[in-house]
Every structure is written in structure tokens, then in C-alpha cells.
Amino acid sequence: CVPLIGENRQLVRQGIKVMNEWQRVGLKELARVAQINGEVNEWNISWQLTPRINVAGRLDHANAAYRLLTTTDQAEAAQLSEDLNVKNVERQQKTQSIVDYCLNELLELQQDDSLLAFVSRGNEPWPEGIIGLVAGRLSEKLAKPVLVITKSDHGYKGSGRSNVEGFNLISQLEEVADDLEKYGGHAGACGFSLTVQQLPNFLNNIKKSAATKLSGLDLRPKLMIDAELPIDNIDLEVAEWLEKLAPFGQANPQPKLVAYRQTIRDINTMGVNSQHIKLRLGSYWA
């Protein structure tokens, strides 16, 4: 990821404007199947378009995404978009299935390590293209660094994610480099490969090393509030002012505002898996 500040922010901002001209029929069709109405923004790109493009390489071959982005034929673009949309649903289902498996294993084995590691069992490996997504979901839910490891043709491949401030995943891998074939990444995300013979030592050594590093850190997730905004001050002018700060992303996060002492009058769940909520606070919906 690159920080969305300075020149980078301006490039992305102009890029979004160009995207909204819909000069590429493939992107236009992909937006249709993603049910994007109106102009796209950085949220649509990150959570609706990009997952459908990336899924080609996660579950199959990236050629389908390449063809979608380069075709000038509307019928081909429509078919490729539909195919990628189906694969994206499959990706979501497989990701959730593996997350559920790992959470059940956590309960059964009563793991309480500072760094959690989950390894695929049996004869069916987990798709290498989605183990990073699984690690990210688990790390966010459990508030701990997580490694997800699956069988590969030549041993094992793994992916790690961490949101723990002060903990560096790539530094941890460097400390146990003798137990790995290859590795790479950065503080919050990593990927690695190792042989069958290396796996036991790797798991033992990295858990010990991580326990030492994490012993003095507060693993509880934190919500950092930028400012208090009384609910009566929320209006179109404020929304337009916040929009001028976009596009949001790395190093330029969307402002987190809080209104204290509010009474929830009504609540509705939204989304396929009820993963979103809609609240009514007094006469306001949020």
C-alpha cells in the first residue's frame, strides 16, 4: 500500500474521475454486476470492484481479469463480469468456511498463544489465494497476529496478518529464517513457504519469539476518535466538507467522529449475512 497523501492522493483522485467516464466497457459491466449505482469512489473500488478483479487470480488464473480490462466487446465484458461475480461469491463462501473451521479449532484445542497459527488438515488444501484474507479476518476478530498455513505441492505456504501496534511480522520471520524456504512482506502482512520437515520447528520457534515480543504490548483493539460532532451539527455542509478530504485510504483514513449520549430508537440489520446495521438515533438514521 502507498500512502494516500500529497501526489499519490491527487493521482488517485484524478484516476477516480477518469474511471467515472466509463471508457472501459469491462469496468462498466463489472460495476453493473456489483450493483454500483452512480459514481464510483474509493470505497466502491476497494470493496466491490477490486475483489471481483482479484478473484480471478485467487481461485483460477488472472487472465480472465486481464481480458475484462482490455476487451472492447460489450458481450464479452458482460460474460466475463458475470463469471467473476460468481467466482467472488465462491471466494466469499470458501473464506468464511475456513474462518469458521479455524475458530472451531481454536475452541476445541483451547489455543491461548500470543500468536495464533492454523494449518490445513487432511488431503484437501486451502486455496493459496485466500489464506491471506482468512488471516486478516481472524486477526481482526481475535485481536492477535495470525498465521494461516496450507499444504502446497512442495510443502507448505503461509500468510500472516497483524493489526497489533508495535509488533512486526516480517521481523518475526527474520528471527526464524532458518526454518523457512522463502518469506517476504512488511510489518502487518507476510507470506512464506517451508518444507514439511521445517513446519514443527517453525511453529514452535515463532510462537516462542512472538510471545516474548508481545508480552508487554496491549493487544486490545483501539478505536481512535478524531473529533466530537454533536448530532444536531450533522448536515449536508459537513458531509460535503468531509468529501473534500477524499479519497481515503492508507495514511489518510476517513475521519472517525463521535456523538455522545445518544439513544438508539430503532435498529435494522442489512447485507446478505446481516453484517451491517442501520440505526435510528432520535430523528436521524445512521
Identify the residue ranges that each predicted region occupies.
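Conserved short beta-strand edge segments in small beta-sheet-based binding/regulatory domains
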Residues: K182-G188, L214-L223
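Hydrophobic helix-and-loop "lid/oligomerization" segment in the mid-to-C-terminal part
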Residues: C1-Q198, M270
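Conserved strand-to-helix beginnings and helix N-cap segments that scaffold or border functional pockets
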Residues: A62, I131-G132, L203, L236-A239
